[in-house]
Every structure is written in C-alpha cells, then in structure tokens.
Amino acid sequence: MDSSFPDWNIEFREQNESYFMESSSCDMSLAMSLLSIIIAIIGLTGNVIVLQLLGFHMHRNAFSVYIFNLSGANFLFLCTHIVFSLENLIRQFHYIDIHMALFSVNVTILAYLAGVSMITAISVEYWLSVLWPTWYHAQRPKHTSTVICTLLWVFSLLLTLWNWIICKVLDYIYNWDMCWKLALIIVVWLLVLFVVLSRSNQALLFRVFCGSQQTPVTRLLVTIMLTALVVLICGFGIGICFFYWKKEENSIMPCGYFYETILLLSGVNSCANPIICLFVGSIKHCQFQCGTLRLILQRAIQESPEEEDEEVEEVVEQEGGEEDEESTTL
C-alpha cells in the first residue's frame, strides 16, 4: 500500500479548509463593502439636509458655522468613500484601474483632516464658552468661527497638496524620506487633535458634573459630546491607516477585514453628526417629539437650557412664516 496516500488526503483536506476560510473571508468583505456604501448614502443625505438648512434657512451663530463646515467636510469625505467602497467591491473579483483614484485620495485626505479639525475646534470653543462665559459672550470677535474654519480648511489643503506633490508628482522612490516625514507630520497633527479633543471633552464633563459652579447641560453640549465620542472611536482609525498606507499597483485587493473595517468605521464617523442632531433635537423633556427638520436642527445646536425651548420654537416658527410670506409674494 502506498504510504503517501494518507499524506495526500491530509493535504487535500487542508486545501479545502483553506479555500473555505478564504471564501468566507471574501463573503464577509463583500458584505462589509455593501454596508459601507449604504451607510455612505445615508450620510450623504443627512449632511446635504444639514448644509441646506444651515446655509439657506437658519440664522447662523458661532457653533452653527462649525457644524456647517463639518457637514461640508463629511459630505466630501462620503463622496470619495463611495468611490473607494465600490473600488474595493470590484477588486474582490478582478483588478480594475480607476483613473479617479488619485483625485479621490487627495479629496479624502482634505475632507478627513478638515472634519477632524472642525469637531476639535467646536469642542474647544464650547469649553472656552463654559470656562470664561463673560469674555466669550461680550468680547469674543464676531467672525471668529468663520476665520478659524477658513484657517483649518487652508491648513488641511496645504497638507494635502504637500502630500500630493512630494509623494505623487515627484518620484515616490527617490523622495521616500520626504514622503515618510510628511506622513509623520500628518499623524502628529492627528495625535494633537486627538489629545485636544479628548482633554477638552474631559474638562467639559468635569465642569458639568464635578465643578464648583453649576453648568447647565444644553442640547449643544450633548451634540458635541456624542459627535466627539464617535470621532474618537471611529474617526482616528483612518488616520493610523494613512500612516501605513501604500499604493499597490496592478494587484487584486486581498480579502481581509482590516481595510473594510476602516472604511466602515470612517463612513459611520462621517454620517454620525446628522443622526446625532436628529436624535438630540427630537428629545424634549426626556420624550421624543416630532417637528420639522429645521426645528429639530435648531434644538440640537441650542446653547440655552431645555427650559427655553418655547422661545426657540417661537423664533423658528416666525422665521418660517416670514419665508413663506416672501415665497408667496414672489
């Protein structure tokens, strides 16, 4: 009897098990890619609604300017997120060369850096408003939010352009040290944002629950805290991935969970803010209450305590009535 026959059976069984595990992994990757696309579509819809309401139907304040820019950054990120999810979905079957990939990568970096910077700026500004309320409401420059948002967009754009010029336009191989150093600078900036965001939220929690002076819990505070929590959990994974990211030319995307998980978490991070605004704005006196999207968003970014809801609702209704009169006259 041939002694190699049992070895052949063992090898055949190991190959079947390996094929089954690889097939299951690819099926899971396929499901995660489809889920990422669905989440991105939901997030795009929510951010478009927020942009439309804050841009054309509501009076802006200091924090609504930040939220408007945050929604704009999330909208850009989700647009490219769908491109990468579709690319990852297709590459699980065969290689495809998407010429928009380089443009999508640059827009993704820009939108991601701007979005993380915006939520950090919102958290820090709210912390300053709680720490020094007199200075904030009396002596704070009127257009501070607009100036800060512009500077954050410009800084994010500069980092993105430097990444594109050094790592893509110039020869990637000969400028490896420069590209690596630039990636390190971006990661250090993300770590700074991570520390500032986490520490400012810890300071807010301490001020609210353990401070000597009673600080009221407003809906805006809840919105900021929940959004910051989602960013800390889901948002910084793609920054770590960027540090190790390397473009692989002419290769089929491997079936693994890491890349799909990063895509899924980044999509959740970018679509969370409209959902959080809808959730926070719908709660009134510990009960869910329906209303127009405009009223719900106004509640979610309300700086005053919950007892002053009636005044906010009256103002929103008056503004809505004025817009209706203008539309009828036109």
From Swiss-Prot:
Keyword terms: G-protein coupled receptor, Glycoprotein, Membrane, Receptor, Transducer, Transmembrane, Transmembrane helix
Positions of glycan attachment: N16
InterPro entries attached to this UniProt entry: GPCR_Rhodpsn (IPR000276), GPCR_Rhodpsn_7TM (IPR017452), MRGPCRFAMILY (IPR026234)
Region (Disordered) location: 302-330
UniProt gene name: Mrgprb8
Organism (species): Mus musculus (Mouse)
Gene3D superfamilies according to UniProt: Rhodopsin 7-helix transmembrane proteins (1.20.1070.10)
Organism domain of life: Eukaryota
Compartments where found: Membrane
Protein name per UniProt: Mas-related G-protein coupled receptor member B8
Ranges annotated as spanning the membrane: 34-54, 63-83, 102-122, 147-167, 178-198, 220-240, 261-281
UniProt family annotation: Belongs to the G-protein coupled receptor 1 family. Mas subfamily.
Topology of this chain in the membrane: Multi-pass membrane protein
Biological role: Orphan receptor. Probably involved in the function of nociceptive neurons. May regulate nociceptor function and/or development, including the sensation or modulation of pain.
Composition-biased stretches (Acidic residues): 304-330
Gene Ontology CC entries for this record: membrane
GO molecular function: G protein-coupled receptor activity
Residue intervals annotated with topology Cytoplasmic: 55-62, 123-146, 199-219, 282-330
Ranges per topology, Extracellular: 1-33, 84-101, 168-177, 241-260
